Amino acid sequence: MNDSRYIGRFAPTPSGFLHFGSLVAALASWLDARAVNGRWLLRMEDTDPPREMPGARDAILQTLERYGLEWDGEVVFQSQRHEAYAAVVDRLFNMGLAYACTCSRKQLEGYDGIYPGFCRNAGHAREGAAIRLRVPELIYRFSDRVQGAFEQHLGREVGDFVIQRRDGLYAYQLAVVLDDAWQGVTDIVRGADLLDNTPRQLYLQELLGFSQPRYLHIPLIVQPDGHKLGKSYRSPPLEADQATPLLLRALRALGQQADPALIGASPAEVLAVARQQWQPDNIARQMTVPEADLR
């Protein structure tokens, strides 16, 4: 298959080094793009400076290169896109589609993350407040390429959500939608922990007149206690001299062929074979895969 119109992306957060779970996500999105001769973009989701780890940006780029996951074009940094985000927040606020919220975390305790609408009609000034997007009492549905049909009632299951924090930083939901549209992304391949974020992004896409990408949410790699691999759980960083065995393990996590005969091959050779054999239909339709099952 050849689809040069395909544009995928990998968008890590520089809050730490890449780990095995990151590799599985990067590999899935890279293979999905390269298997159809599409483009694969790299975007650094660095909208939250307090969470950034010094040196993580460069380490992420170096790790991807060492593992043979080369990207197209220049790396995009969300920290350089604030003007675009601000313009859209202003637009939504001025249209009455967003409003200022002064609620504290303590006020919102006990609502299970569903905003109860305290500030919806309060008319607060924007200064020092968060900005929330009004959501409709509608069900948003989409078909995920792995997880299948998914739906969410935005009003009941999420409530009005933040697009700009009270400290002025822009929320993930806003930035990801604007950047995917700006970069022309047609296909989003990412972890299943973001599956329930998708309806919020569909709503924003609809409001702003953007095309809807195709979505593929892969199972998360989890530790024995059920927590996903991640920086907050001190998951070990990817080692440069383990690229080939870890790529083969990542292929197994994605339900792909991982020929043991390739153990002595270079990362580029492993990726060349995997690209030809990529079968996204073989990815398990489940939310998690225990890392212990892959050893």
From Swiss-Prot:
Binding residues annotated for L-glutamate, in chain numbering: 9-13, 45, 172, 190
Residues that hold Zn(2+) according to the record: 101, 103, 115, 119
Motif stretch ('KMSKS' region): 228-232
Manner of cofactor binding, per the entry note: Binds 1 zinc ion per subunit.
EC category: ligase
The protein's name: Glutamyl-Q tRNA(Asp) synthetase
Top-rank taxon: Bacteria
InterPro entries: Glu-Q_tRNA(Asp)_Synthase, Glu/Gln-tRNA-synth, Glu/Gln-tRNA-synth_Ib_cat-dom, GluQ/Sye, Rossmann-like_a/b/a_fold
UniProt EC number: 6.1.1.-
Organism expressing this protein natively: Pseudomonas entomophila (strain L48)
Amino-acid positions noted as binding ATP in the UniProt annotation, renumbered to this chain: 231
